[in-house]
Amino acid sequence: MFDFSIVTTFIDNLLRQTLGLGDFLSILIECVLVGVCILTAYALIAIVLIFMERKVCAYFQCRLGPMRVGPWGIFQVFADVLKMLIKEIFAVDRADKLLYYLAPFLVIIASVGTFSFLPWNKGAHILDFNVGVFLITAVSSIGVLGVFLAGWASNNKYSVVSAMRGAVQMISYEMSLGLCLISAVVLTGTMQVSGIVEAQTGAWNWLIIKGHVPAILAFLVFLVAGNAEANRGPFDLAEAESELTAGYHTEYSGMGFGFYYLAEYLNLFVISGIASTVFLGGWAPLNIGIEGFDNLMNLIPGFIWFFGKTFAVVWLLMWVRWTFPRLRIDQILKLEWKYLMPLSLVILIMMTVCVSFGIHG
């Protein structure tokens, strides 16, 4: 399989040896290139997911979805982006201006930072540390501040109630989310994200397969907790339109609102990407131990495997959103603290026992 690190090594050698640039300029140019790549991927993924959401929603509601602007309505998203870019940005008179303008950037930083840890091909990752799983949970937690500060700084009673709901929900479900990731770390023996994928290469070696029942349960709990962490339906209580107008971002307009809108979809992609990376092998192809089949699967580029698995999980989460009704706040917290949290602890114990006695693939 193609190793993307060859490309990054070539660029580094081009800057340092061929062009003769010093360390500072080389690193600066490389950082700029990485930033451009991240923002470009961020925008493209958000556009694709918004269009996909509209079509999936229409499918489940027996409609066609956007069809007017361009073929199959593919340019509708671009029209909406243009409208959002030119809208006026304003704040209410009694808002805390510093926190009001800071909050959307915190949400973007959290989503982009977490997105940077995803390895979408062999050797293709922006950040890769030996404590990657720990850093993913830490960076993603910054988004809670963005949600809470948006409601608090807006000086709007509906926004404050929404922010309280969103914060308590996100903090609660981070517990189950983290325990499921720890279960994967116990099985693979590493916290490095690229190492987790490498541990899943080989025949029938995806974690959800070799981890047996505990891994399957951890995957399902992770999807539920991740959906709640991203404030997606049926856990979108923080944005309950019939109760709280638009939720914690009621007082935002233009790109202030746009940042929250984009972050929601990137968080959806990040949760799906982490699920596919940790439990479904990430960029690792499906190998079953039959040489001819395995050789054929290995011909498919790693990024196709990664994006294919990720968008399959995205579709599943969209299916859940447009099928189930919104839960109440007491139901959401009861689901986490009375069911998912104890189940996550049991899964972790089961996984530890399986690894200790060698009962895994």
Indicate residue ranges for each PLM-predicted region.
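Selective transmembrane helix interface/packing segments
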Residues: 2-361
